[in-house]
Amino acid sequence: ALIIGAGGVAGVVIHKCCQNSEVFTDICIASRTKSKCDKFKEELQDKTKTNITTAQVNADNVPELVALMKEYKPDICINVALPYQDLHIMDACLECKVDYVDTANYEPEDTAKFEYKWQWAYRERFEKAGITALLGSGFDPGVTGVFCAYAQKHYFDEINYIDILDCNGGDHGYPFATNFNPEINIREVSAKGSYIQDGKWVETEPMEIKRVYNFDQVGEKDMYLLHHEELESLALNIKGIKRIRFFMTFGQSYLTHMKCLENVGMLRTDPVE
C-alpha cells in the first residue's frame, strides 16, 4: 500500500495497517515533508512485521505522484492527504492503474464547499481502467454508510429518516483545538449547513439549527446541523428515504474562539494581501 499523508488521520491509518501486517505486508508512507514519514517508520518498524519505506512527494503534482507509483508499484493508494489533492491523486491512480481509497471528498482550495460530483465524474474512467475507487472510507463518511446499508439489508424494508450524530466525548483541556486538520474542520463548521428533505437540499445558516442530545456514556451535548458528504451518497442508495441530517457536537468555548477568528477575517479563503 502507498499511504499519502503524514498528519493525524494518516497516523491512525499507518498504525492500523501495521497492526494488520498479514494484509499490509509492505507500506510506503509518502508526504511533502519526508521527515514526518521517517518519524512514523522509526516509531513502528520494531513493533510490526510490515516492511515500511518512506518517500517525499508533492500531492499537488501529478507527474511526481505517477513517478512514485511507478517506482513503488502499490496494489492500493490510501489517500489521507488534504481533500484539495483528491483529484490529483485519482489522476495518478488512473495513469498507473492503482486502486484508490480516501476518507473525505474533494473540495476546491479557494471555496469552502465540498460535494461528490467532481469525484463521481471519474466513475466511468475507473471502470474502463479496471480499478476501484472507494470514496469516503473513514468513520463519517464511511462507517456511517456501512451502518445504514447494513440496517437496510438486514433489518428494514425501507428507511425513511436518518440522523447521523457525531459526538466526541473526550476533553483535552484546551479552550480551542480541532479533532482533525484545523483548516478543513473550521471550513466545514463555518460553511452553511444543509440537509435533504423529500429529495431536495434545504440550506441553513452556519450553526443555525441546534439540538441537545443525551449521548450514552457521554451525557448531554450541544450539537449543530452541518452539511456532510454522506448525505449525498445515502440519498442515492437508501430506499424510501425522506430526510437525512447530520449533526456534530461542539462546546461553547470552541464556538466562541471560532467566532473571534471569523470576526478578524481569519476564516476567509481568499489570500491575505
Which residues make up each language-model segment?
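N-terminal Rossmann-fold NAD(P) dinucleotide-binding loop
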Residues: 10-14
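Rossmann-fold NAD(P)-binding glycine/threonine-rich loop
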Residues: 104-132
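Rossmann-fold cofactor-recognition segment
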Residues: 46-61
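C-terminal catalytic/substrate-binding lobe primarily of soluble NAD(P)-dependent oxidoreductases
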Residues: 153-273
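Helix N-cap at the beta1-alpha1 junction of Rossmann-like dinucleotide-binding domains, i.e.
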Residues: 33-36
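ADP-ribose/adenylate-binding Rossmann-like module
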Residues: 80-83, 92-115
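Conserved Rossmann-fold cofactor-binding substructure of NAD(P)-dependent oxidoreductases
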Residues: 57-74, 81, 85
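Conserved N-terminal Rossmann-fold NAD(P)-binding element of oxidoreductases
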Residues: 1-8
